[in-house]
Amino acid sequence: MGGYMDNLPNTWEEWISNFEGWQQRVGFDPSWLGDFELSVLFDWERAGDVIEFGDYKGRAKWERALQVPHQSMRDALITMITVQGDTEFASVEQQRHLLASAPTDYDRYAAARIMAEEQRHGWQMAYLLMTYFGQQGRREAQKLLERNAQDGDRLLGAFNIPMPHWLDFFCYTMFVDRDGKFQLGMLSTSAFKPLAASMGPMLKEESFHLGTGS
């Protein structure tokens, strides 16, 4: 496989094709998803229409990238979305091998469900990048599939650490996913409406991850 510029997707369908290649490379069998459907979900009502905090409080939330007032703010949005998506795919790379040694059938089901939902969350972030941020977004969406936790080049250090044992997984879902819940909660108030609207469904799914570690 060439570098990410050789596989830069121009459409969402092309990105999905590259995503399927990522699944093959990391050894995630799509059949493990069962009847779980990878999809893009929004809760527009929960996102609200009005900016809640900061210098732009009280104004209409931004629905397109060009409505964001400054390039530095658009760059910050791309960074936040990219980091969130990067963690989702990284966690699958860290955890995938554990399915072969699950202590119980339920543990295997729980881990497979968590990995399915993490892939959906990664999809969601890639969709935002592909749909709203032009060529820069397409580049970042592709790079989500190029970095790999096993190579130690995911963006956040915690998502490059090996997870050799199920106790690691349980601690991960107890603490790292708990931190992730608060991160999603903060993003749910984003002034960029598509990002805020992405968080409602993600938070609902994240609650199962926390329950697994509790």
Each predicted region: which residue ranges?
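Inter-helical turn/loop segments and adjacent helix faces that build the functional surface
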Residues: 97-109, 133, 182-201, 214
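Internal, hydrophobic cores of structured domains that mediate oligomerization or house catalytic pockets
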Residues: 162-169, 176-180, 186-187
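Conserved aromatic-histidine-acidic binding/catalytic patches
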Residues: 72, 76-87, 106, 110-117, ...
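Alpha-helical transition-metal enzyme core signature, strongest for iron centers
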Residues: 84-92, 114-129, 148-152, 170-181, ...
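Terminal targeting/low-complexity segments that flank the catalytic cores of oxidoreductases
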Residues: 1-109, 131-163, 167
